[in-house]
């Protein structure tokens, strides 16, 4: 959520920056609502002052033995007018807030201006895609060869865009998540967390999934109207519960940064993606991810973004997977991000790079919604923290990359050296 004072005092400057994202801010509508708010604010304050003054007059008149009934009626009338003005002001402020909740974050100045993914800018590349001297198999074919990926069983159990993993493929999937968690906790300084997979409405508002992206979520539907689970939703990413751990908190600046990680399943409806990536593990309704979240001082957030992205890169480097790093243009960034790096891993069967991690600086956009603040010992004044989030990594897509990049001519899959301790020393699947 943007700073309301910025929207009030510099609407044209805000509109210009939002236009870089392809978002049109209705400055005239906001201006009209703000003028009406000011009028109502003054009206309620004047009515409150007048009622207080007349209420005091009742006591004074009573002490003098005067008839207080006319004054009492007048105070009652002022009270009714005040209640009506307050109700109108509350409704207007709610309307302004509803509009503010749909406005995306401002892009950082260094973010390239563009319309969509075609305007993203490559920053660097790591590794060289392997040249195969045999016909490359995709991960679906490899998974079926080793009886490790069963999409038909998942359709029977649930529906499309789900999978049942079995045997050594399932074991490698688990090994990847354990390897990522160990790397982030033991070398990168993150604290491991286990979080709920169902969250409430306040949590979803805090990180920006609501109200704008309600259609992307899986919501619970209780059997009884009175059930207290009616407002729960499955998490689309561990960013949601991890970041909200600081909601409503005032943090000592000496305790920053706070660096958290969690391995969770993620649940997404994939609204708007009909017909895209229908084969395999690339786009699923349920997938695992190891998430990284940092809570930092405002002046440290850009450096933290570089650090966090480097942590995600380290996973790919240790796995020996070629990838490229890109900075997203203004038109392709997520709703809450001010700056985002994507890491795209090489997928041999598609002969292209595919997103495997997205790392974003959100500035104080989420913190303002959550009222997450920090305070130094030398200053009693609080300020909003900055929040960052990043994939470290998407486990299913990492499994795809390992299976395809490490495949052998006979269909076996070599186990990357860093994963072997998690697989009892196994060198090959198959």
Curated annotation (Swiss-Prot):
TM ranges:
none
What PROSITE patterns does the database record attribute to this sequence? AA_TRNA_LIGASE_II
Domain free text: Consists of two distinct domains, a catalytic core and a N-terminal extension that is involved in tRNA binding.
Q: Lineage in the entry?
A: Bacteria, Pseudomonadati, Pseudomonadota, Gammaproteobacteria, Enterobacterales
The metabolic or biological pathway listed in the UniProt record of this protein is: Aminoacyl-tRNA biosynthesis; selenocysteinyl-tRNA(Sec) biosynthesis; L-seryl-tRNA(Sec) from L-serine and tRNA(Sec): step 1/1
Q: Tell me which family the UniProt entry assigns to this protein.
A: Belongs to the class-II aminoacyl-tRNA synthetase family. Type-1 seryl-tRNA synthetase subfamily.
A GO cellular component annotated for this chain's UniProt record is: cytoplasm
The protein's annotated catalytic reaction(s) are: tRNA(Ser) + L-serine + ATP = L-seryl-tRNA(Ser) + AMP + diphosphate + H(+); tRNA(Sec) + L-serine + ATP = L-seryl-tRNA(Sec) + AMP + diphosphate + H(+)
Q: Which Gene Ontology molecular-function terms are recorded?
A: ATP binding; serine-tRNA ligase activity
Gene Ontology biological-process annotations: selenocysteine biosynthetic process; seryl-tRNA aminoacylation
Principal subcellular localization: cytoplasm
**What is the protein's given name?**
Serine--tRNA ligase
Describe its function: Catalyzes the attachment of serine to tRNA(Ser). Is also able to aminoacylate tRNA(Sec) with serine, to form the misacylated tRNA L-seryl-tRNA(Sec), which will be further converted into selenocysteinyl-tRNA(Sec).
Q: What is its EC number?
A: 6.1.1.11
Intracellular or extracellular location(s): Cytoplasm
Q: Which InterPro entries match?
A: aa-tRNA-synt_IIb (IPR002314), aa-tRNA-synth_II (IPR006195), aa-tRNA-synth_II/BPL/LPL (IPR045864), Ser-tRNA-ligase_type_1 (IPR002317), Ser-tRNA-synth_1_N (IPR015866), SerRS_1_N_sf (IPR042103), SerRS_core (IPR033729), tRNA-bd_arm (IPR010978)
The record's listing under Pfam families reads: Seryl_tRNA_N, tRNA-synt_2b
Assembly, per entry? Homodimer. The tRNA molecule binds across the dimer.
What species is this protein from? Shigella dysenteriae serotype 1 (strain Sd197)
Per UniProt, the keywords (alphabetical) are: Aminoacyl-tRNA synthetase, ATP-binding, Cytoplasm, Ligase, Nucleotide-binding, Protein biosynthesis
Which residues of the sequence carry a binding annotation for ATP?
268-270, 355-358
Q: Where does L-serine bind?
A: 237-239, 291, 391
